[in-house]
Design a protein with these regions (language model features):
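Interaction-prone helical segments in low-complexity regions
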Residues: 1-3
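N-terminal acidic leader/helix
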Residues: 5-41
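Mature extracytoplasmic or otherwise solvent-exposed domains
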Residues: 22-23, 32, 49, 79-81
């Protein structure tokens, strides 16, 4: 016997939208901070790790989504700034 999927309430949709918006703001601010340059490579990596932790806190069990959506942006930026290959 299969159960029908439940439809999320407006409050649940609003809450998820707030969490998405918060994560997007943090990611954009983190990218901007790293892009300013002048910080050690390790500090840039710590910023990425902090953004990843926030994503996992906001969306438990969805760390793979961060890796698909945001990690490539961080990698491109860090590679360009620190001339990594």
């Amino acid at each position: 016997m299969s159960s029908a999927p439940t439809i999320p309430s407006n409050a649940e949709i609003d809450e998820e939208s707030r969490r998405i918006r918060r994560l997007r703001i943090v990611v954009n601010m983190s990218l901007g901070l790293i892009a300013q340059g002048g910080m050690p490579y390790e500090e840039a990596q710590e910023i990425v790790a902090a953004a990843r932790r926030l994503a996992e806190d906001l969306f438990p069990g969805k760390g793979h989504v961060f890796e698909l959506l945001y990690l490539p942006q961080f990698r491109r930026l860090i590679s360009a700034l620190y001339r990594l290959q």
